[in-house]
Design a protein with these regions (language model features):
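FMN-binding flavodoxin-like domain, especially the glycine-rich phosphate-binding loop
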Residues: 1-132, 202, 208-210, 214-249
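Functionally constrained cores in energy, signaling, and assembly domains
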Residues: 10, 33, 70-71, 142-144, ...
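A short, structure-level motif marking secondary-structure boundaries and short turns
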Residues: 39-41, 140-141, 168
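Charged, low-complexity surface patches
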Residues: 47-48, 148, 176
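A mid-sequence, solvent-exposed acidic-amphipathic segment
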Residues: 123-160
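Iron-sulfur cluster-binding cysteine motifs and their immediate structural context
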Residues: 144-145, 154-172, 178, 182-200, ...
Length: 249
């Protein structure tokens, strides 16, 4: 199967392993010209992770090198913990301006080193995530579907982890959630709420005292949600089909 590497990279993110892994599997199977001009752009919120470095390692195994790398800070949308930050009306204009410059760099085939995660930041991220990782397996236990759900199936179509199945017109989660927030951000009815039950996690063997973040993980209908206004649910669904097609090979 042939596609363009640009199509895959548009959805590669560093902090959400499912999208990274799905992209990785697809890229590993791509046939790429050894002379290709390969670019990557990370779009972090507060801290730039290791998305570009992950891609670099994948391509290195294919004897390929990234020609151009850059980063653009955007809106953090992990709405289970905090509202969209910085406010879109403040950050998006700056983001668009920088993206326009990056687009011109790419058109001109400029060379630029990829952004790399700071050692101190990486150590902090690794320490934090190591505590949260055991919870990730049960993270979707916190999702609650309200009566506002109309059974449209948008959540299923945009979930890159194939974690949602529509049964009797209601979404059912299958314990493979990677917390990308696509389902809650694109739900037209805001019918997906969230609150983890600590007692339920304890029954699963999770020491909730070590994972303090779960105490503040909460989402209600009134909670603010955010997704890129230029990316539709249909486009995400299309990307998901690309990932799935590679997994079937």
């Amino acid at each position: 199967m042939k596609t363009t590497i640009e199509a895959i990279l548009t959805t590669m993110v560093g902090g959400r392993p499912v999208t990274r892994d799905a992209s990785a599997r697809a890229i590993e199977k791509l046939k790429i010209n050894s002379k290709a001009y390969i670019f990557c752009v990370a779009m972090p919120s507060f801290v730039c992770g290791c998305a570009c470095e992950c891609l670099e390692n994948i391509l290195k195994n294919k004897n390929l090198k990234i020609s151009y790398g850059n980063k653009v800070y955007s809106v953090a949308n992990y709405c289970l913990v905090y509202p969209p930050l910085p406010p879109a009306k403040l950050i998006v204009p700056r983001t668009e301006k920088k993206l326009n410059k990056i687009a011109h760099d790419i058109i001109e085939r400029k060379k630029r080193e990829i952004p790399r995660v700071n050692f101190i930041v990486k150590k902090k991220i690794d320490k934090t995530m190591s505590k949260y990782k055991p919870v990730l397996k049960y993270a979707d236990l916190g999702f609650k579907i309200t009566d506002d759900c109309i059974g449209c199936g948008t959540c299923d179509r945009v979930c890159p982890a194939n974690n949602i199945e529509i049964i009797k017109n209601k979404p059912v989660f299958k314990n493979k959630c990677e917390q990308c927030m696509a389902c809650v951000s694109y739900c037209p009815q805001k019918a997906i709420e969230y609150k983890l039950d600590e007692n339920e996690l304890k029954e699963k063997g999770i020491d909730t005292k070590k994972v303090k973040i779960i105490k503040i993980m909460k989402l209600t209908k009134k909670s603010k949600r955010y997704h890129n206004p230029y990316i539709t649910s249909s486009e995400l669904a299309k990307k998901k089909k690309i990932y799935n097609s590679y997994d079937k090979q």
